[in-house]
């Protein structure tokens, strides 16, 4: 029946692509010289699957729905598309990006700024947990070309007219499924009402629940649909191991034994609950191991400091929860440890797929108790991948 969703899109299903053009080099995308410089300086060589497919229709001004997970290069896809379309001489906000978390919004802002480094484009992150007055002053002084933000704060700024929709020609919703599941639906609908009806809409989502389909149906015109399949998400190049710890209480000693190996590069350790993050951090500190920790109960300032230290390499081991798996994108991380296996298997790729993006090599180590064995097999089957017992010389692989 047609009421389930638009053509080619079933609720909770996988969308059907209706765009088959593939451009496999950034040079062939008709991008400006200064943008190309930024792309290559950022370390990209060849566009990823989603970039090969989605940048062109975005630049041509089509509404685009892309079904893709993090780790596929989706942020750069819309960042490049926005930067290509901005009129630099027009000192007005021309693109608006919404993201579900502050971390992700800041991450996107960093990518936009890095890629637009040689263009002089301005991009401001509009997020909760920061000083409203300072933000208002900034927006009033000079409207940034691009705003990236969380729905609540962005709507607030539009509503109070500190942010003008007049010249916004491109509206991007990143991780739309996450935003809607976090209860931002009303704010998102309100933001749509404030934008011009001819604003280009680009929507990215890992899954397509009915509330995401509703947005596409209500606010998008004849959208181009692009699917980047799960297997194009890289577990490739990532060596995955498990350690048989038998019992939960033996994980701590195992982690301490691994500590030397962790600090060869930078490592992220994933835990399933915030309280346990604090518990493990305390235990590690008590044994004189240096680790930093981050989770959703911390305030924004604290999280920023920790991320900064980790990005700069001054802190080497970060303990965190899934909430932040999507907001951590650290080039140097080549080791991920699942102290706890993820409670849902989709999160496995969010955790691991960061370690070795775009062919960067990485190692993932899963700590497995007796009870976890089934879950591990389940993950192997789901991703059609193999997870072997960790060899003794694991340090040589990192």
Curated annotation (Swiss-Prot):
Q: Where in the cell is it found?
A: Cytoplasm, Perinuclear region; Cell membrane; Cytoplasm, Stress granule
One Pfam family recorded for the sequence = Helicase_C
Residue(s) carrying N6-acetyllysine: 110, 166, 185, 230
One GO molecular-function entry: RNA helicase activity
Q: Which residues carry this modification: Phosphothreonine?
A: 150
- Cross-link type Glycyl lysine isopeptide (Lys-Gly) (interchain with G-Cter in SUMO2), placed at 138, 217, 230, 301, 361, 373
Which residues make up the binding site for ATP? 68-75
The UniProt annotation puts motif Q motif at 24-52
Q: For this protein, what reaction is catalysed? A: ATP + H2O = ADP + phosphate + H(+)
Annotated InterPro entries: DEAD/DEAH_box_helicase_dom, EIF4A_DEADc, Helicase_ATP-bd, Helicase_C-like, P-loop_NTPase, RNA-helicase_DEAD-box_CS, RNA_helicase_DEAD_Q_motif
Q: GO cellular component annotations, sorted alphabetically?
A: cytoplasmic stress granule; nuclear stress granule; perinuclear region of cytoplasm; plasma membrane
Q: Which PROSITE patterns match?
A: DEAD_ATP_HELICASE, HELICASE_ATP_BIND_1, HELICASE_CTER, Q_MOTIF
Q: Tell me the superkingdom of the source.
A: Eukaryota
User: Where's the Helicase C-terminal domain?
Assistant: 237-398
**EC number(s) in its UniProt entry?**
3.6.4.13
Q: Record's family?
A: Belongs to the DEAD box helicase family. eIF4A subfamily.
How does this chain assemble? Answer: eIF4F is a multi-subunit complex, the composition of which varies with external and internal environmental conditions. It is composed of at least EIF4A, EIF4E and EIF4G1/EIF4G3. Interacts with PAIP1, EIF4E and UPF2. Found in a complex with XPO7, EIF4A1, ARHGAP1, VPS26A, VPS29, VPS35 and SFN. May interact with NOM1. Interacts with PDCD4; this interferes with the interaction between EIF4A and EIF4G. Interacts with RBM4. Interacts with DDX3X in an RNA-independent manner.
Q: What is this protein called?
A: Eukaryotic initiation factor 4A-I
Q: From what organism does this protein derive?
A: Oryctolagus cuniculus
């Amino acid at each position: 029946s047609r009421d389930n969703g638009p053509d080619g899109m079933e609720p909770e299903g996988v969308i059907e692509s209706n765009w088959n053009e593939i451009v496999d080099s950034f040079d062939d995308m008709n991008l400006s010289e200064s943008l190309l410089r930024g792309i290559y300086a950022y370390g990209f060589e060849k566009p990823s699957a989603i970039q090969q497919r989605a940048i062109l229709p975005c630049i041509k001004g089509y509404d685009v729905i892309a079904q893709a997970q993090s780790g596929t290069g989706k942020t750069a896809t819309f960042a490049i598309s926005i930067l290509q379309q901005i009129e630099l001489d027009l000192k007005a906000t021309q693109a608006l990006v919404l993201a579900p978390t502050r971390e992700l919004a800041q991450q996107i802002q960093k990518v936009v700024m890095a890629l637009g480094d040689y263009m002089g484009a301005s991009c401001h992150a509009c997020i909760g947990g920061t000083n409203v007055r300072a933000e208002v002053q900034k927006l009033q002084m000079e409207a940034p070309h691009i705003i990236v933000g969380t729905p609540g704060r962005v709507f607030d700024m539009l509503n109070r007219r500190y942010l003008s929709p007049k010249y916004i020609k491109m509206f991007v919703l990143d991780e739309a499924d996450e935003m809607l599941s976090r209860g931002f639906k009303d704010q998102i609908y309100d933001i749509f009402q404030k934008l011009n009806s001819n604003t280009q809409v680009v929507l990215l989502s890992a899954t397509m629940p009915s509330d995401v389909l509703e947005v596409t149906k209500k606010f998008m015109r004849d959208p181009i649909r692009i699917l980047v399949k799960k297997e194009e998400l890289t577990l490739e190049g990532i060596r995955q191991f498990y350690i048989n710890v038998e019992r939960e209480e033996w994980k701590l000693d195992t982690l301490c034994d691994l500590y030397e190996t962790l600090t060869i590069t930078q490592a992220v350790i994933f835990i399933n609950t915030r309280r346990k993050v604090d518990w493990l951090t305390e235990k590690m500190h008590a044994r004189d191991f240096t680790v930093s920790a981050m989770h959703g109960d911390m305030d924004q300032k604290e999280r920023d400091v920790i991320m900064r230290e980790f990005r700069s390499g001054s802190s080497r081991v970060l303990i965190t929860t899934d909430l932040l798996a999507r907001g951590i994108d650290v080039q140097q991380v080549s080791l991920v440890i699942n102290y706890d296996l993820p409670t849902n298997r989709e999160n496995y790729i969010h955790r691991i797929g960061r370690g070795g993006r775009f062919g960067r090599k990485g190692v993932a180590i899963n700590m497995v108790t007796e009870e976890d064995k089934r879950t591990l097999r389940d993950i192997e089957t789901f991703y059609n991948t193999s997870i072997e017992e960790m060899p003794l010389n694991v340090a040589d692989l990192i």
